[in-house]
Curated annotation (Swiss-Prot):
Reaction equation(s) it catalyzes: 2 D-alanine + ATP = D-alanyl-D-alanine + ADP + phosphate + H(+)
Organism for this UniProt entry: Bacillus cereus (strain ATCC 14579 / DSM 31 / CCUG 7414 / JCM 2152 / NBRC 15305 / NCIMB 9373 / NCTC 2599 / NRRL B-3711)
PROSITE patterns cross-referenced by the UniProt entry: ATP_GRASP, DALA_DALA_LIGASE_1, DALA_DALA_LIGASE_2
EC number: 6.3.2.4
Gene: ddlB
Entries under NCBIfam families matching the protein: D_ala_D_alaTIGR (TIGR01205), PRK01372.1 (NF002378), PRK01966.1-2 (NF002526), PRK01966.1-4 (NF002528)
HAMAP family: Dala_Dala_lig
Domain ATP-grasp: 140-345
Protein known as: D-alanine--D-alanine ligase B
Example GO molecular function: D-alanine-D-alanine ligase activity
Compartments, as annotated in UniProt: Cytoplasm
GO CC aspect terms: cytosol
Length: 361
């Protein structure tokens, strides 16, 4: 059987660099090397691209994935010939890319656009869904147009805030009240997010969030259970069972997600069949409103009255040992190794479908 030459793309110039390394390590452990040739492609924290030797055997430490040596790093402008050759005749050709990148410069449509220009199959969402899914303000605007119920929100640009901070704080207090959540608009993994109960905490949260992005979003607090569902597919997506996150802290922050695992995951979540159906329905609506492909994880709040509010969609959920997405599919009957193989199949399917498009008149 001919092996699929799989390029694992990980690292990235992002605050979520370490998360990406953890995701890559988990994927490598799960991939069947009888079916796949694994070719690591590392993006350093400085944005340099390095292609390593084919992975054979076991990798046990994320540090082994940090390929060093500036002499081997190149500019993305040379990718098509030096890092990711896709011509079938080339010995180092790559059949499909699996981007395991999180945050800006990876999950936001930039890398997806590069791979589109190179006309190479890649796992996951395209340029539109990736960019819209990364920007919480754009995403919420799209969800509003799709008729999805969500928390009230307000967005702010750093330059305007610097000119009139009082106006920004007053807008939050008048429109949203306390408590509220302040978040960078273009970052995931709960980086830079703070829950604010008063003006002092709000001011501090604005300062921190603007360190990570030029645009931030502030959302009203919805009192409810945090539930999530996985979506898998292309034109006909399907949903996993619904899971629940029960953080021991005030909310599900970066440390709870990736460092100490100080959170309980309940899969499947206890709820009525009607509540589960509404969550799955809205997850599909969100996926299709973004023109999703491959996968998303949709996050919701479920109130004690049974009201469902969509929080956000993650277009590249993590695959770490604590990650909800693979666990949801495991409990749905799709084990992690098979999940990854299905994502690769979907990537190839989508690429073949796009080759049918006519570009000349």
């Amino acid at each position: 059987m001919t092996k699929i030459k799989l390029g694992l793309l990980y690292g990235g110039k992002s605050a979520e660099h370490q998360v990406s390394l953890q995701t890559a390590l988990a994927a490598i452990k799960a991939l069947n090397q009888d079916k796949f040739e694994i070719h690591p492609i590392y993006i350093t924290e400085q944005g340099q691209w390095v292609r390593g030797e084919r992975i054979e055997g076991e990798v046990t430490d994320v540090e082994a994935l940090k390929m060093s040596g500036a002499e081997n790093a190149i500019s993305p402008l040379s990718l098509s010939t030096e890092i990711i050759p896709s011509a079938a005749s080339e010995e180092n050709a790559i059949d499909v890319i699996f981007p395991l990148l999180h945050g800006p410069n990876g999950e936001d449509g930039t890398v997806q656009g590069l791979l589109e220009l190179m006309n190479i199959p890649y796992v996951g969402n395209g340029v539109l869904a990736s960019s819209a899914g990364m920007d919480k303000v754009v995403m919420k605007n799209i969800f509003a147009e799709a008729g999805l119920k969500q928390a009230k929100y307000a967005s702010f640009i750093r330059s305007a805030w610097e000119k009139n901070r009082e106006e920004a704080y007053s807008k939050v207090e008048d429109k949203l009240g306390y408590p509220c959540f302040v978040k960078p608009a273009n970052l995931g993994s709960s980086v830079g997010i703070n829950k604010c109960k008063n003006r002092e905490e709000l001011e501090d949260a604005f300062v921190e969030a603007f360190q990570f992005d030029r645009k931030i979003i502030v959302e009203e607090n919805i009192v409810g259970r945090e539930v999530e569902v996985g979506v898998l597919g292309n034109d006909e997506p399907k949903c996993s069972v619904v899971g629940e996150i029960v953080p021991k802290k005030d909310f599900y922050d970066y440390k709870s997600k990736y460092i100490d695992g100080d959170t309980a995951l309940i899969i499947p979540a206890e709820m009525t069949e009607e509540e589960s159906n509404v969550i799955k329905r809205d997850a599909i609506i969100a996926f299709q409103s973004l023109d999703g492909a491959g996968l998303t994880r949709a996050d919701f709040f479920l109130t004690k009255d049974g009201e469902v509010y969509i929080n956000e969609v993650n277009t590249m959920p993590g695959f770490t040992p604590f990650s909800m997405f693979p666990l949801l599919w495991q409990h749905t009957g799709l084990p992690y190794p098979e999940l990854i193989e299905e994502l690769i199949r979907l990537a190839i399917e989508r690429h073949e479908e796009k080759q049918k498009i006519k570009y000349t008149i």
